[in-house]
Amino acid sequence: MTMREEIEAAAARYPDRRSAIMPALMIAQKEHGHLPGPVLEEVAQILGVERVWVYELATFYTLFHTEPIGRFHLQLCDNVSCMLCGSEALLTHLETTLGIRKGETTPDGAFTLSTVECLGACEMAPVMQVGDDYHGNLDAARLDALLESFRAAERVTSVERAAAAPGE
């Protein structure tokens, strides 16, 4: 199914097509990896809504990305509960370990580091979201283990891609 068909199918579930902007953005981001201007315009055109409505949602919610992000998007909560449990020190640790600052992506494109206002998981503070998964009760050692597991997954994926490459 094409992106247009998926968006049309999602929009059919709503009485007002404006209500379908969020699911349409999710579909478009899954297809393109992020939501640059032309993709936002395409979503608005498919839904028949004002571009500003699409742009407002795409730039308000932290789950949408208008710029490319790394294969692993590390979103560290920096709200009160997580701060009280050490998220500031964990942010510094991640910046030092990865050699990037908040808002940046590693040169190899593997990791993007962000902070988010609240992940709604205060019971396991400090917490970080990576993709759809939450990782809680974090400390520097757990972060290092997580980063290594992500790097190991990257190595496996790279080997699989190389093995699947035609003519090699």
Swiss-Prot record:
Keyword Transport part of the UniProt annotation: no
Documented EC number(s): 7.1.1.-
Cofactor annotation: [2Fe-2S] cluster
Record's catalysed reaction(s): a quinone + NADH + 5 H(+)(in) = a quinol + NAD(+) + 4 H(+)(out)
A GO MF label: 2 iron, 2 sulfur cluster binding
Enzyme class, broadest EC rank: translocase
Keywords from the named record: 2Fe-2S, Iron, Iron-sulfur, Metal-binding, NAD, Plasmid, Quinone, Translocase, Ubiquinone
Entry function: NDH-1 shuttles electrons from NADH, via FMN and iron-sulfur (Fe-S) centers, to quinones in the respiratory chain. The immediate electron acceptor for the enzyme in this species is believed to be ubiquinone. Couples the redox reaction to proton translocation (for every two electrons transferred, four hydrogen ions are translocated across the cytoplasmic membrane), and thus conserves the redox energy in a proton gradient.
Protein name (record): NADH-quinone oxidoreductase subunit E 2
The organism of origin for this protein: Rhizobium meliloti (strain 1021) (Ensifer meliloti)
Gene this chain is encoded by: nuoE2
